[in-house]
């Protein structure tokens, strides 16, 4: 892919939005309507491959120039590489999800402002309905998106007060039973792509839902609310 990457983007990184769009273009046979779980996983894997390919080339060019013994410049460069990887992983995850929601005809707002200036990653059907006191809260859904959870999953609990049951989508495999039990006690529903379910215990799998199931929940609520796109 390197020649095409350089032809398109030169010796530099495009925005995450542009790069995510490009990653999907290289997978024309993947259709989210048929299998949202497979599509999300395929898009993420392909973008990771493409990004590492371009990154290796760009970083190689910089390393070949050397740092002339400038330790601070080297450390700064190293940190920028690490930070770019972290930020791009999270944004790519959201970009591909946004594309899938659009293809499936799901209405949403991304990082809409709720109480205390909180910004849930995705709010369904959107901020207008959320802030409408007449709109039935049972037809509202929020989704936090974290490529890896660790202890950060608790952040989503305070991001949408009108919604009792929160949803969290992650790519993290084998989250501990203690953690998922705590999620359940906090009324947080974990969403994991189908391909990762086997890394969880049978008991956990009976509770975890996949991406397809989540999109069906949102579409059903959207239909109940009489919202059409």
Give residue spans per PLM region.
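Short, charged, amphipathic alpha-helix that recurs within catalytic cores of restriction-modification
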Residues: 152-169, 178
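Hydrophobic beta-strand segments of well-ordered beta-sheets in folded domains
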Residues: 141, 164-170, 187-191
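Acidic-basic catalytic patches of nuclease active cores, encompassing PD-(D/E)XK
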Residues: 70-118
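Short beta->alpha connector loops
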Residues: 146-151, 171-175
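Domain-level recognition of nuclease-like catalytic cores that cleave nucleotide substrates
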Residues: 173-229
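Interdomain/boundary linker segments immediately adjacent to catalytic/signaling cores
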Residues: 3-91
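Anion (oxyanion) recognition and catalysis
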Residues: 102, 160, 184
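Conserved catalytic cores of phosphodiester-cleaving nucleases, focusing on short active-site segments
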Residues: 122-147, 156-158, 168-169
